[in-house]
């Protein structure tokens, strides 16, 4: 039985690799709807010097995965966190149970989203 109405995941996904796919699958086991926040091209340039694929390309690829129900753009912040995405989803779905599930580059020590306590459960190392 799925625990949450919505599970939020986020990342650059530039390019998508098997670790991302495992995260998508893991997120889908937690909730009925998976919302994937894709970081902006500007965020990718700041993180790694360039964007391999544009936001539009990454979004189209992400939307094709059966585990992802919706892809959202969100405003990047100075920490590279998905806090603005969490706020955006919570405003769009105020009556839903929501979890944020991430993996990859994030750990308990470098995840600013972990401090976001506005009714959203937090999972690290999803998938």
Predicted regions and their residues:
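Nucleotidyltransferase catalytic core that binds NTPs
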Residues: 1-127
């Amino acid at each position: 039985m799925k625990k949450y109405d919505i599970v939020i995941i986020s990342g650059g996904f530039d390019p998508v690799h098997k670790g991302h796919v495992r995260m998508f699958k893991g997120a889908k086991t937690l909730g009925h709807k998976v919302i994937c926040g894709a970081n902006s091209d500007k965020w990718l340039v700041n993180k790694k010097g360039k964007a391999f694929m544009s936001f539009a390309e990454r979004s189209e690829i992400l939307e094709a995965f059966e585990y992802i129900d919706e892809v959202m753009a969100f405003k990047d912040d100075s920490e590279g966190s998905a806090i603005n995405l969490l706020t955006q989803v919570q405003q769009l779905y105020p009556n839903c149970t929501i979890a944020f599930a991430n993996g990859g580059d994030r750990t308990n020590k470098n995840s600013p989203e972990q401090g976001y306590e506005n009714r959203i459960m937090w999972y690290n190392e999803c998938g």
